[in-house]
Amino acid sequence: HSIEGGAVAFHDPELKDLLYQLKNFGITGYEQVEYVGANGKMNEFQAAMGLCNLRHVDADIAKRKVLTERYRERLGGVEGIRLCKEKAGVRYNYAYMPVVFEGYGADRDEIFAALKEYNIFARKYFYPCINDYACYREQFSSDDTPVAKRIASEVLTLPLYPDLSLETVDEICDIIL
């Protein structure tokens, strides 16, 4: 990691200019803006932290893969628990472990609360649904996006980081199951 926000690494040199422009508000030249961009610049300290951590990326991904496989082994095939399908030919970074609780014996919020009792902090990603944010509520209704509304209430992202132990993954799964 590079402290806050992250970094981009890629193999395709043609992406360099595009990514530079996107991280600089979409500016492509003097008084020229071609893309909807953002302020994606980092300071020198963040860059140094990112460079120091870059050497650990492959090992961290390998550790996360082992942990993800354990979650899949324990939670896969359980009725009412849906895991994201992995696609052939895709190289995953195993950054997140999202789980959808749909028709399981406990709902997402009950699982969240049960884990919290054991000081295990899962995350309710995509919640609340973006069109329920105060700044959008008057323009949009989550009733207009029923699938997003449902998924926002069912997804729980379980802890997944390189130093997490298999024993802790098993404890998390035991609490859920």
Describe each model-derived feature in a short phrase.
Residues 3-8:
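Glycine-rich phosphate-binding loop of ATP-grasp-fold ATP-dependent ligases
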Residues 11-177:
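PLP-dependent aminotransferase class I/II
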